[in-house]
Curated annotation (Swiss-Prot):
GO terms for biological process: methionyl-tRNA aminoacylation. Monomer. HAMAP family: Met_tRNA_synth_type2. A motif ('KMSKS' region) lies at residues 295-299. ATP binds at residue 298. This is Methionine--tRNA ligase. GO terms for molecular function: ATP binding; methionine-tRNA ligase activity.
């Protein structure tokens, strides 16, 4: 088995500050990356910023600042988001970096040498906001791009990529690789778009300067999407024998928003085929967020600042809500009341309550120690229904993650916590203390073990809080991988637990 795993977010466009959509994509990708590390994979997790193009140049001009200084400032705000959201990326690529420009030039030359790029003249509609070209037939009745972006008529010399040549090859590839695009609804949209006919794509501009110059023809700037998509290989050191390229490419998963799926599922694989580069294995397109049922936009003044949410509720609480509230791939609605309800009813009432009740009882009634039981008794405990449920946890959740059904993993965790809360109520260790002390110890051990399973499975989602849970339980820091969720790595009988503290406070 290949033990490497390469996952990417899209690189984020730096014409504005980070918002909830950036946070959502980043957290989802981070959860997957952390999950794969816990499975024992050697993970490469990439994020970064897309810093070229007409939109960035205009934004810099409007602020009366040099484009490089502008991108330096805005790129830093995305780095700050990654730190604030506890994103565990292994690399952060900027398209203004030398390593990226060098790789793009090599990639361009490969396309040129293979006869897939030619010179011509572009005349048509272009949306600066989307950095995308559109046919007349794609415009709305109001003459806007499908995204609602205004378009302008562009006439200029251009290099073209012979996208039309790759139409049949793309359709053959989609057919042979049904898991290439997720979810299936997005896959069907892409196939329909490609079947409707592909036209050759303009891949250079001459009407602005902020971008990577075309090799040997500096009047042209490479189209921002060709430049940007190449980040996935430039960050690995494309064609550099000493780099990570041979180790990690092709990517296992590109996580993208549904608005940029066409670029990733049509243009990118066509570019790669033309450059004789293996294609990524899966592209996962997630949905958009609304705010209290309204479309989020600057004009409505209802953008959601993830940093402010973290400051108010805590990073793990925000991470949990984003992953729990929505089926990954579907659209979601941000409602403050729903965020508070998720935190209080699930993190605090179900997981936090179970942890507090169990550890407090052990701390006060068993000298702050994991019950000292024989292996025979521990084996008997593992035959309890609740431990049987926990024992199937890893296998079930790996299958769900393989299908990127992230919120269902959290549903499993909450269900197990509910089952454990029912178990503690029905067994009533506070009564057993008087009537059957040995049985009390068995019940406490079972509950502590269930909490160990829950905490390790929560590590990808709420890493800081889950590690605090494991610290309270006295779990060795070297025994917090999925491979440790078996009977061989049970809590050490007689070991100490920490004095309980509240990890999941409630909010009003």
């Amino acid at each position: 088995m290949n033990n490497t795993y390469y996952i990417t977010t899209p690189i984020y466009y730096v014409n504005d500050i980070p918002h909830i959509g950036h946070a959502y994509t980043s957290v989802a990708s981070d959860v997957i990356a952390r999950f794969m590390r816990l499975r024992g994979f050697d993970v490469m997790f990439l994020t970064g910023t897309d810093e070229h193009g007409q939109k960035v140049e205009k934004a810099a001009i409007n602020k009366n600042i040099d484009p490089q200084k502008f991108t330096d400032q805005t790129s830093e705000s995305f780095r700050h988001l990654m730190t604030a959201m506890h994103i565990s990326n292994d690399d952060f690529i900027r398209t203004t970096e030398h390593r990226h420009k060098k790789a793009v030039a090599v990639f361009w030359q490969k396309l040129l040498d293979n006869g897939t790029i030619y010179e011509g003249f572009y005349e048509g509609w272009y949306a600066v906001r989307d950095e995308a070209f559109f046919d007349e037939s794609e415009l709305t009745r109001d003459g806007l791009a499908p995204t609602g972006a205004p378009v302008e008529w562009v006439k200029e010399p251009s290099y073209f990529f012979n996208l039309s040549k790759w139409q049949d090859k793309l359709l053959e590839f989609y057919e042979a690789n049904p898991d290439f695009i997720r979810p299936i609804s997005r896959r069907n949209e892409v196939i329909s778009f490609v079947k409707s006919g592909l036209k050759d794509l303009s891949v250079s501009r001459t009407t602005f300067n902020w971008g990577i110059k075309v090799p040997n023809n500096e009047k042209h700037v490479i189209y921002v999407w060709l430049d940007a998509l190449a980040n996935y290989i430039s960050a690995l050191g494309y064609l550099d024998e000493q780099s990570n390229y041979n180790k990690f490419w092709p990517a296992d998963l590109h996580v993208v928003g549904k608005d940029i799926l066409r670029f990733h599922a049509v243009y990118w694989p066509a570019f790669l085929m033309a450059a004789e580069v293996p294609l990524p294995k899966t592209i996962m397109a997630h949905g958009w967020w609304t705010n209290e049922g309204q479309k989020i936009s600057k004009s409505l003044g209802n953008t959601i600042d993830p940093i402010k949410l973290i400051d108010e509720f805590g990073v793990d609480q925000v991470r949990y809500f984003l992953m729990r509230e929505v089926t990954f791939g579907a659209d979601g609605n941000f409602a403050r009341s729903n965020l508070i309800t998720r935190i209080n009813s699930e993190l605090s009432n179900k997981i936090g309550n179970l942890l507090q009740r169990t550890t407090s009882f052990v701390y006060k009634n068993n000298d702050a120690k994991v019950p000292l039981l024989t292996q025979g008794v521990i084996d008997k405990i593992y035959e309890l229904p609740i431990l049987k449920t926990a024992s199937k946890f890893v296998e079930q959740n790996i299958l769900l993650m393989d299908k990127t059904e992230i919120n269902k993993i959290l549903e499993n965790i909450i269900n197990l916590a509910e089952e454990a809360n029912i178990y503690i109520d029905s067994e009533a260790p506070w009564n057993l203390k008087k009537t059957d002390p040995d049985k009390m110890l068995e019940v406490l051990y079972a509950l502590l073990e269930v909490l160990r399973y829950i905490a390790i499975m929560l590590l990808p989602f709420i890493p800081s809080s889950a590690n605090k849970m494991l610290d309270q339980l006295g779990v060795n820091k070297e025994e917090r991988l999925f491979k440790h969720l078996i009977r061989d790595y049970t809590l050490t009988a007689g070991s100490n637990i920490l004095e309980p503290t509240i990890i999941f406070p409630k909010f009003e």
